[in-house]
From Swiss-Prot:
Keywords: ATP-binding, Ligase, Nucleotide-binding, Protein biosynthesis. Its EC number is 6.3.5.-. It catalyses: L-glutamyl-tRNA(Gln) + L-glutamine + ATP + H2O = L-glutaminyl-tRNA(Gln) + L-glutamate + ADP + phosphate + H(+); L-aspartyl-tRNA(Asn) + L-glutamine + ATP + H2O = L-asparaginyl-tRNA(Asn) + L-glutamate + ADP + phosphate + 2 H(+). Heterotrimer of A, B and C subunits. Pfam families: GatC (PF02686). Transmembrane segments: none annotated. GO terms for biological process: glutaminyl-tRNAGln biosynthesis via transamidation; regulation of translational fidelity; translation. SUPFAM superfamilies: Glu-tRNAGln amidotransferase C subunit (SSF141000). This is Aspartyl/glutamyl-tRNA(Asn/Gln) amidotransferase subunit C. InterPro entries: Asp/Glu-ADT_sf_sub_c (IPR036113), GatC (IPR003837). Allows the formation of correctly charged Asn-tRNA(Asn) or Gln-tRNA(Gln) through the transamidation of misacylated Asp-tRNA(Asn) or Glu-tRNA(Gln) in organisms which lack either or both of asparaginyl-tRNA or glutaminyl-tRNA synthetases. The reaction takes place in the presence of glutamine and ATP through an activated phospho-Asp-tRNA(Asn) or phospho-Glu-tRNA(Gln). One of its GO terms (molecular function) is ATP binding. It comes from Synechococcus sp. (strain WH7803).
Amino acid sequence: MSNITADDVRKVAHLARLDLPEDTIATYTGQLERILDYVDQLQAVDTEGVPATTRAVEVVNVTREDKVEATEVREDLLEQAPLREGDFFRVPKILAE
């Protein structure tokens, strides 16, 4: 059985960038403890000889051949841009130098 404390819940919430109201900490403590108890049960299951997998059903990508097609909408699209610099969209800077 896991021994989860209120401080453990606060730490997990902090790491996950969650602002948990103090009156919910006890509820989350119990829930997290039950989750970890379930994980302990799963760890005890004998999986010898069972192949590792990431999903129950195989997934494949459906692809199509790329086709280059001429279009006349370039200028129409550029005219709709809130900010434009020549033949390019101008976007706000998001990364610091």
